[in-house]
Amino acid sequence: MINKLVDKIKKTTAPIVVGLDPMLSYVPGHITKKAFDELGETPAGAAEAIWQYNKAIVDATYDLIPAVKPQIAMYEQFGVEGLKAFQKTVDYCHEKDLVVIGDVKRGDIGSTSAAYATGHLGKVQIGSKSYSTFDEDFATVNPYLGTDGIKPFVDVCKEEKKGIFILVKTSNPSSGEFQDRMIDGRPLYEWVGEKVAEWGADCMGDSYSYVGAVVGATYPEQGKILRKVMPKSFILVPGYGAQGGKGADLVHFFNEDGLGAIVNSSRGIICAYKQDKYKDMGITAENFADASRKAVEDMIEDISGALANR
């Protein structure tokens, strides 16, 4: 799957991923009203609203982008109905030939980690048959429990030719409370980056490993260091746009070939219709997905321009 991601990035010339992280408050009123009229102000109604919201955004952007990243918590908050919306979103994005990164941040050990890996990336055995359930192409994983937590995911990645992105240096302000702690003269995130490179060394695609890393756009200097530590690992870069990251901050996340990183924007794209710059173009809540498409185009221009001028 890492090969497909690289190929899609090359074809679209867009090293970006759209984060499908829908809060109900983001959904335009006409969509929410229709869903509530049909299903009531219930978890099912909320799930239908966010599904329709996602579908419209995907329809407006799928030809421009290589991948999407649904954040499962935004769906889980609505219980089983929300997970149905998550599954519909994953399946629909696959119909559009998009790579799906499940932002699930799983982290456990042994059989529990294996069950997470099977559910999100592998096949579950039921009697004489096997099934792919959530069936994402990549999943985000928390490394805090060490190799015991990561190995079950790596094993499934090898078997299914899928991938993971391991949290290394995250974009949130308090990430340094642990991730910047010095151990033998080096910050913890560097040690984790070295383990990512080690875990990924024997599960390579054509150019990059199935085992990638999450490094926040809000920490460009750390990204520069980690790019050298993990030369064969793809970096998923959150924190662009709403969290403050800009194209000029991101050039060191990429290798000299212009590959090696994929930049996520969530609110900056899915809530673009609320921004004044798009309102000034005449975009309203009724045609919100047009703003999402324009935001994707602007993001591609920003990042491509920065890479061309580095």
Task: List the model feature ranges, each with a label.
Residues 58-64, 92-95, 154-159, 227-230, ...:
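Acidic (Asp/Glu)-rich catalytic clusters
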Residues 65, 134-137, 158-164, 207, ...:
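Glycine-enriched alpha-helix->loop->beta-strand junction motifs that scaffold or abut catalytic
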Residues 104, 108-212:
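Conserved anion-binding
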Residues 217-264, 268-275:
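A C-terminal functional module that forms or caps the active site or interfaces directly
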Residues 28, 45-46, 69-82:
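Glycine-rich, proline-tolerant flexible connector loops at the mouths of alpha/beta enzymes
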Residues 18, 68, 103, 139, ...:
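Conserved, mostly hydrophobic/aromatic
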Residues 250-256, 271-310:
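C-terminal helical cap(s) of enzyme catalytic domains, especially alpha/beta-barrels
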Residues 1-60, 283:
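N-terminal glycine-rich anion-binding loop in soluble enzyme alpha/beta folds
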